[in-house]
């Protein structure tokens, strides 16, 4: 902790790749009429300054050091809006002591990338006459391009009924919402800001950005809650990529390739299956992919069908030992089981049975089904999940359906089922930091879901058909049209690499996808892995695949894992699949880039574009590339990044190019 001199002192610290400047304020400066004082956190990317005047804290300025541009501000740092009474703000609350500047220690074993990096933080404590205490922090990690602000609100001896928490209210020329839904950040040329919560809201009015979160329940006496916001700086023309770098640092777990089998459409389709079925499929995939073709399998997801719906999240009689034998068998292939659970109870007939069982046991429900935010059901559901980790070593959960986002259940500590789901995931990660969490139905493309979950649902039906061609070609078109319309257009800052796309489908219970008479499976596989998605699901009945199908699957899965560091940059290019327009995905890294294009039409199509636009090349990047087809001829072609290039695509062709800078 730095020492405070009589008037003020300036502390200048230099470490690899960053420079931090702090101005400390003397306690004497808090007297009425004292001149304003300032303190700053800064590195090579971003600088932020706050002012202390008359015992209050305000923003002063932000500088984007990539562009040398500065935003001036005199805004409050936080405002807490009570349901009754006066607003609690960074200017109105009593500051208990001068700002403290301290180290942010690294946590080398954390599952979160940012926590592994040291940095510095400013901290101030506030209090009001009623005993409400607020701890404000501003944090800057070494080598990052953003500053996070965190506010922890401690209620005193009485509950604190708050309606809204405001953490962003600044002048931001050119500001616009990145998407229409909740949890959408605000962007402005080379800046981004946001309230780090998927249920948050932002508004832009006359170049001023405001972000807040609404609350229904009071903060209970003696309890505390923490909220956070981010302000980031980007390079010119690199808004998406630099925002993605922030998200990759702060998300619950960094991007990772997670290849696994899913039993839906194969073992069960609203049917019950048993231990023997599960062990057999583990062996089938393990032998074909791991033993014969040296593919790394991460998990085996057992979807709806493992439980007895009349008992509520207990195994059906076909699993006398639970997942014990499945876990043992999966371990022989260096994998582990995953499990499907539906917080709201699932779907159709099994859901009705689960609801009947829940009501008989006194668990809370709402119009969507089971209420995860209900005190009794939350404890039961959490304990069921914990048992899956402790007893069977599951390494992923598929949480299918999270219920209401607005209704408060009587006696609950949560504002909604979504709020309860977020809290549950936090508890599970404390138990098993590398657990994979797939949060499906009910989500939407707010990037802030990834502060909790690893992936969310793309939207739409599990599978359906759009466009023209064979059933498999029309399924591919449908899948990708849902990505385009539900995510690319609605939440462009949500990374495609973290969507649940509903996988590869070649299964006995999958409507019109239980065979492949047109031999289009390779197109599905190549396009799927070309998206860069980390949640790599195989809805596959193993006996339906030919040796050639297994070879294509294995080759592509290994290609994806090998190129993971490139593919995590995956972003959409081209048009609307449903309109039969050429589209695809592009990924860039310093040493290699990947371009995947698909023609959803039964007619040849040309696609003309500049490579620097497709790859969103940074200013100092290579301007010429050698391109090689990943799945075709070894022949290569040189492409200039600055000149328009025409790609000729055959009907339904999937073209994957690996690009090496020259």
Regions found by a protein language model. Give the residues of each.
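Acidic-aromatic substrate-binding/catalytic surfaces of carbohydrate-active enzymes
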Residues: 36-123, 176
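Active-site-adjacent "subsite" loops/lids of carbohydrate-active enzymes
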Residues: 267-272, 336-392, 403
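Bacterial N-terminal signal peptides that target proteins for export
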Residues: 2-18
